[in-house]
């Protein structure tokens, strides 16, 4: 039966880690005071009749702490790329220079910092909800084992305690990521 527990815990851990990775991806799209190429990950460019991620039509680099550069591979894509960056909702003003697009990052206002911190909180809460959903699935699996008399009540409680500890540890990591991201956002 320990093999079943190990399999269950490994599956739950994998799913909880997936929620953490999603949270990290969402956090990388939130603007902080520093330039980060991942900031432009959500940008989609109209290319060849379809919407394509920016990283499939250009290279993003960080030459300075408050500047991104976007090197477009196809000269014909420069205007579409500039428009996509301008319209992505991050308040950026791209400046084309041949095939190179400079994207200066303006200072964040206090109001914008608060909005970003709230968005980070919402993302973290979404991750917590996902982790609790995984926990619920694990608990239901344990109850199913108990009903089928594959494990006893005591063993079921032990398994449930281990699932709860896994959940608590993952939620603690989520909270730590949130504190770190809020610190980055509020840093002037």
From Swiss-Prot:
The keyword Cytoplasm applies. Keywords: Cytoplasm, Protein biosynthesis. GO terms for biological process: cytoplasmic translational termination. It comes from the Bacteria. Pfam families: RRF. InterPro entries: Ribosome_recyc_fac, Ribosome_recyc_fac_dom, RRF_sf. The keyword Cytoplasm applies. It is found in: Cytoplasm. Signal peptide: none annotated. Its main location: cytoplasm. One of its GO terms (cellular component) is cytosol. GO terms for molecular function: ribosomal large subunit binding. Belongs to the RRF family. Responsible for the release of ribosomes from messenger RNA at the termination of protein biosynthesis. May increase the efficiency of translation by recycling ribosomes from one round of translation to another. HAMAP family: RRF. This is Ribosome-recycling factor.
